[in-house]
């Protein structure tokens, strides 16, 4: 049973589709963005003017994808469609031929004209592949699912700013920022001079710049209210800089041509200034649609700020824009009329989603294509040119491939669980091309801003260098067509909240001038606000207002938080830092073998599970006609059966297991939108990341020191926290110089037992249990004469036997792994599979591991309470409740007060009440609208009810509510003090000890330094760093230190000798010279420094002789 704490707040229709930001953006790209960028491709004419190429971008077509999503994943291909665009190649001199045909009766002309018309008619041409989005909002690139995350950047438009210069004097500036092209900035410095800056570097007097773009004195005088101020400020500069070079003395008499030359000389100081070149340069900088683009957003923002009415399709600067923006700057400086802009305000920052990012990348590819076409028109013979050899698809394909493969915004999708997948799609990053750099980003841009309310979550962000630069969309937020984030509100009229009316989506700059009431104010039955005076948000401040002044009301108390944060019950009782950790750790929860929905939730679990795409949703009303483990059939009213295929034991990007299970039965009536199959980490259509287990907050023999967890063996034996992990192992069968490699069961020098699990082809059978070192695929590689061992050569010489000249290169299971083979995929060139060059066959083996919870695994609650398992205690030793129920996990009580995440206590106590009263609770955070201390009152009330229902008085003791007298399982006696016990929702995180634990005896070494490699993946050693050396020095452990720095590290001769000595049981010899010391010597010698050690010897005649010691020789060094 679920108990909703909120009545009308959680209306279903309020919630947008949480993955819609990706899908809608790509949809608009296909419908508008792609045709717009293709249509902007210019008509290309060759230098002679005889040949013309034209694209008809609006009529583009996409060919049906070659591979389905499922096939693209299994074959390591990209799920994409080919773009065909109608193009026409025209010969201007073809009219001459047509005239000849009309005057001549020779038939040869007629046939020639037919060929020419065929060659130069309009026809579709292939320009590249476009990766397509799957119905879950992802892309399949080279077989892996990827996400394009949303980027938040400064919006194009006009911005006014007041700042301090180097001398701490105020300067006023106005920046006109474009979507594509040069930036223009007007600046009034501390000396009251007005400058125009182009691209931040080159500056010139503002008046001269205005004259250079074609404005005369009359135009400037009409539009500028402070015309004289502009003239006076320009005069000083003009006299100082240009009075010698320019004939006129009066600045107002300067001509447009002279102004153009001045501006050009400032922008290109080393080039001769000519009028035509200067005019062309200024035109291309600000007025050429090909080179300069404000975008629809920039035009909208300029019109809004400067109160202009320029059409949205006019996307270059106009002289009026420049004049009005300068006039606004002069007014703000002189008369304080106008407002400055806050760059961190969300009204001035916009989101670039996948569609726009892809559009920009296609534009880059088309620009490269245009350059190649122009070059070919110049180089090639006109008669030999045709559409097929003129239009090359490679530039566009390379540009798109580069974006998806290596862009900072294209990321390997986080598929750990449904929540991590959904959050990844809703992520917003300020990094990436055209964005910020995490090393240079200041505190202001990372900080919270009042305009973030309801738009960007203030809680969910990474810890570390990316804090504040990567965020997540709030749960109700939408992105409008201009890229600005909107949040919904209810309209309020005369104190009545119009909840039955439509929702109003409001942008951040609109919100500044509205009085918006919070969602947790009390309303009567007719939705009238009960209080006479309430706190509202207005102009980024909290003020009080009467109910008649209120314009809008927020829709929900959780409006400002993200999807992950909204899953934390009693969030308002947690410190923000711990809530941040809780949000991030929920995304790391590994899908369990037996998922269980939480007793205490927030009501959003079903919505998040549905929108994540991990469950299967019915697309029609009907009746279930067929159910199996792999397929569900639903018959609709028309009698047609729609089949839904379930994913069984698929491997995710993070090696977790994706397995879908049906939750309907034959004959059941199904409604459209109903969940018919659960996926990973879902239970009954709700997200289920962990398990409900009994927790006790108490110390136990020091085993929960520093946040460690003590768990019961019940969690192991009953598989409560068992998860399945699927690893993929791949083997390529290549063509070598000595012949082709062979997949076979006949492997030299291998026992029959080792190949017992292989089939007749040498491939492991599905269902086999494999341990570390077992052969998965048998393979032999031809070897040359030099690869033969001396014994082999001798045998061949004696017996003349042509033995198999092959060596064993089989695929074996790596160390410390074991599991069951769940799938084998074989790709052969002979069967028509596309394989890399030189590869004849690829075999992939999928091995599933069942991992039980063990010491060293990481667990966490939803409130940032994380820890490592320190010990697994037997069931009889665990403390138990008065009714005999043993505790499942013991947490450290010292982890609560200083962390200030008290929400975990409310959750576990309410969970205990729910367990004993067979109820589940959905708690909306911020419940103070129901009264003071509402959370505590609810928890105590439910505990009391559970106590009376079950006749268990120990569940609620008025003397110490929420605490229980526990019995020590070892002694059978009560502990001295009552202990807080409850039922909490605990997650097992993906940081598993099996993936972390590592040891090395011998292994690979670095080629140059001969020191062991580092890291688990390279089977490396532990670094003995500077501080460890200091510690050994401090203890005087000289021989230990010598051994660690030589024999155990990079003394090549010494380590071989030491190994032989250990094997033969002899004393370990003295160490020699480390290889890294030899490298140092060589580096010094390369700098022409002769570093040498000399040994002084006393000769028989009494003289001293200096003998140089070769430091590269171990024998000479050891003899010193």
UniProtKB/Swiss-Prot annotation:
Domain of life of the organism encoding this protein: Eukaryota
EC number, as in UniProt: 2.7.7.6
Family that this chain belongs to: Belongs to the RNA polymerase beta chain family.
Localization per record: Plastid, Chloroplast
Catalytic activity: RNA(n) + a ribonucleoside 5'-triphosphate = RNA(n+1) + diphosphate
Keywords from the named record: Chloroplast, DNA-directed RNA polymerase, Nucleotidyltransferase, Plastid, Transcription, Transferase
Native source species: Gracilaria tenuistipitata var. liui
Physiological role: DNA-dependent RNA polymerase catalyzes the transcription of DNA into RNA using the four ribonucleoside triphosphates as substrates.
GO terms for MF: DNA binding; DNA-directed RNA polymerase activity; ribonucleoside binding
InterPro entries named among the record's database cross-references: DNA-dir_RNA_pol_bsu_ext_1_sf (IPR042107), DNA-dir_RNA_pol_bsu_external_1 (IPR019462), DNA-dir_RNA_pol_su2 (IPR015712), DNA-dir_RNAP_su2_dom (IPR007120), DNA-dir_RNAP_su2_hyb_sf (IPR037033), RNA_pol_bsu_bac (IPR010243), RNA_pol_bsu_CS (IPR007121), RNA_pol_bsu_protrusion (IPR007644)
Protein's name according to its UniProt entry: DNA-directed RNA polymerase subunit beta
Subunit structure: In plastids the minimal PEP RNA polymerase catalytic core is composed of four subunits: alpha, beta, beta', and beta''. When a (nuclear-encoded) sigma factor is associated with the core the holoenzyme is formed, which can initiate transcription.
Transmembrane segments: none
PANTHER family (alphabetical): DNA-DIRECTED RNA POLYMERASE I SUBUNIT 2
Entry GO CC: chloroplast; DNA-directed RNA polymerase complex; mitochondrion
GO biological process: DNA-templated transcription
